[in-house]
């Protein structure tokens, strides 16, 4: 826990906090610009649409670059790699820091939906349990993408290159989902996109790809897939860092 806390403390004054707040808030606000949602379900659907297909996965890439940027300054990399701390702990700590920020984005999204729904739209009652459940499940699904983006950011000084890679992976994932390519959800970025839409629609035709119902089975499958993919990426990153200086 201490390594993760240390990584979070490194982000004091970082723009990562602004990214984690502004992207989900902008998504919810934009959901109300052209068409006024007349219910909680429609507000949620419109909020997670473009957010899940582009903003969130690319946002994870930006957060990963910000988390690793401090290590690529001056001689910080040499100091990091020469410490007695096992490489896997560093990789896990970085991934966890990125994932915590991603989870914060999901919390902000849910809170923004509640605030806009009650304060601006005057919707009756409170947001349905779907919002909380889907938000929590999406946070879990972000873990593999956080690990992959962390790995990409670890191997380059460039801030923009990992973001560009994240944009490309997001585009590939969304395109392949729209093309109904079997198993594409095993791509971390596609898993994020698919999970953001879970339970939001009764039929997948509204998004162009199949949308799962939110059930215990679909939730368990998402959690299991996320855990396995995250473990694989972290193990591969650790092995690669142990074998190379990883500097460009």
Go through each PLM region and give its residues:
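Hydrophobic alpha-helical transmembrane segments
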Residues: 1-5, 43-51, 76-88, 110-113, ...
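Residue-level recognition of transmembrane alpha-helices
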Residues: 20-24, 94-95, 166-167
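Aromatic- and glycine-rich beta-strand/loop motifs that create alpha-glucan
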Residues: 1-21, 245-247
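Helix-capping/transition residues at the boundaries of transmembrane alpha-helices
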Residues: 10, 69, 80-82, 149, ...
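Secretory targeting signals
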Residues: 25-60, 64-65, 92, 96-159, ...
């Amino acid at each position: 826990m201490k390594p993760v806390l240390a990584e979070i403390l490194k982000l004091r004054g970082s723009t990562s906090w602004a990214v984690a707040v502004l992207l989900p808030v902008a998504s919810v606000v934009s959901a109300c610009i052209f068409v006024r949602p007349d219910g909680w379900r429609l507000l949620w659907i419109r909020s997670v649409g473009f957010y899940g297909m582009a903003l969130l996965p690319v946002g994870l890439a930006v957060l990963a670059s910000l988390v690793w940027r401090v290590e690529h300054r001056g001689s910080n990399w040499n100091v990091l790699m020469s410490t007695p701390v096992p490489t896997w702990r560093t990789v896990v700590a970085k991934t966890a820091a990125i994932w915590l920020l991603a989870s914060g984005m999901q919390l902000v999204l849910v809170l923004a939906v509640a605030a806009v729904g009650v304060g601006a739209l005057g919707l009756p009652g409170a947001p349905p349990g779907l919002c909380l459940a889907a938000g929590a499940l999406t946070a879990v699904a972000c873990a593999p993408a956080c690990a992959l983006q962390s790995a990409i950011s670890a191997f380059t000084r460039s801030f923009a290159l990992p973001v560009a890679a994240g944009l490309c992976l997001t585009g590939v994932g969304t395109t392949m989902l729209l093309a109904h390519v079997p198993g594409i959800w095993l791509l971390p970025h596609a898993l994020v996109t698919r999970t953001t839409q879970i339970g939001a629609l009764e039929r997948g035709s509204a998004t162009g790809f199949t949308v799962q119902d939110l059930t215990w089975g679909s939730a368990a499958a998402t959690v299991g897939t996320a855990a396995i993919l995250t473990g694989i990426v972290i193990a591969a990153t650790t092995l690669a860092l142990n074998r190379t200086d990883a500097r460009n």
